[in-house]
C-alpha cells in the first residue's frame, strides 16, 4: 500500500499542476510565471505541468486504490482523470494550431513532436502520453516529425534528429523536455 500511496500522491500533485495549466490557458495567464510566484511561499511546491502522466507506476498504481476504495477515493480518481485528460487537451491545442496555420498559409503544417518518452532523460515509452499524442496526431492526419533523442527507431514511425525537425517543421511542440 505504501508504494501505491506514494505514486497516488505524486499523481495528485501533478494533476494540480496540469489543471492549473489548463485554467491559466483559459484565463490568459502565464502558468510558468504563476507557479514561480506561488512557489516563493515556503510551504508551496507546485510541480511543472506536462502533457499528462506516464510510466508503469504513477499512471497505473492510483487505479488500484480507486478500484478498492470506491467513492472514498474520489480525489485520487479525479487526479487520474485530470492527468488522462491533459493529453486530449494537448491534442486539441496542437490540432487547432495546425488548422490556424493551414488557413493562414494555404497548406498543412509539418509538426515536430519533441520527446516521446514518459519523462525526461529516459528511453522508456511505456504509458507515455507524449507517444500517445504523437500517434493520435498521425492518425488524425497531421504531418508529424517525431523526435526522441533517447531511442534510435520506432516501429510505427520514423524518428528524426531534433536539428532536422526544427529546420523542416512549421510548428514545434515540446512534449517532453530532454
Can you name each region flagged by the protein language model?
Residues 1-178:
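Structural/interface elements that position substrates and couple domains in central-metabolism enzymes
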